[in-house]
């Protein structure tokens, strides 16, 4: 039963989420944020690297998923985000984890069924898929969503299994079921 860590990189808050995949079932293990406020950038990167490394050593995930950098309107923000992402990936690779990368749109499509979903929709679906009773922080929910996306992409999670896990909430309609006869 592999453990998957998802990372939602950020220069001030880096979210992490760990799930266990057992066949078609996903189980919540841990989630939270690595806070790096009020330090200069090299110190923030050091905290991200050390935080990711500590979490991986504690839980021992065998797979990792990281959200790719989006193109921000502010180039400085995009550079900082890229640096934070690099620190997290370096920590994962340093511990011999293979890193899968997904765009925000791919993650949202996998978890919510809609690539332009908002943060609230992602949080609610993460809660539903993992049977959580408390809404995770936004960054932690995004990291859990990355881990869920990777579990879906890794092969044994069929679309039908995902729909069953959701209790039919996201029932799809075939074209034939929407036609008038």
From Swiss-Prot:
Keywords: Cytoplasm, DNA damage, DNA recombination, DNA repair, DNA-binding, Endonuclease, Hydrolase, Magnesium, Metal-binding, Nuclease. Its main location: cytoplasm. The keyword Hydrolase applies. Mg(2+) 2 binds at residue 67. Mg(2+) 1 binds at residues 8, 139. PROSITE patterns: RUVC. Its EC number is 3.1.21.10. GO terms for cellular component: cytoplasm; Holliday junction resolvase complex. Its cofactor is Mg(2+). It is an enzyme of class 3 (hydrolase). Binds 2 Mg(2+) ion per subunit. GO terms for biological process: DNA recombination; DNA repair. It catalyses: Endonucleolytic cleavage at a junction such as a reciprocal single-stranded crossover between two homologous DNA duplexes (Holliday junction). It is found in: Cytoplasm. The active site is at residues 8, 67, 139. One of its GO terms (molecular function) is DNA binding. It holds the Pfam family RuvC. The RuvA-RuvB-RuvC complex processes Holliday junction (HJ) DNA during genetic recombination and DNA repair. Endonuclease that resolves HJ intermediates. Cleaves cruciform DNA by making single-stranded nicks across the HJ at symmetrical positions within the homologous arms, yielding a 5'-phosphate and a 3'-hydroxyl group; requires a central core of homology in the junction. The consensus cleavage sequence is 5'-(A/T)TT(C/G)-3'. Cleavage occurs on the 3'-side of the TT dinucleotide at the point of strand exchange. Belongs to the RuvC family. NCBIfam families: ruvC. Homodimer which binds Holliday junction (HJ) DNA. The HJ becomes 2-fold symmetrical on binding to RuvC with unstacked arms; it has a different conformation from HJ DNA in complex with RuvA. In the full resolvosome a probable DNA-RuvA(4)-RuvB(12)-RuvC(2) complex forms which resolves the HJ. This is Crossover junction endodeoxyribonuclease RuvC. It comes from Acinetobacter baylyi (strain ATCC 33305 / BD413 / ADP1).
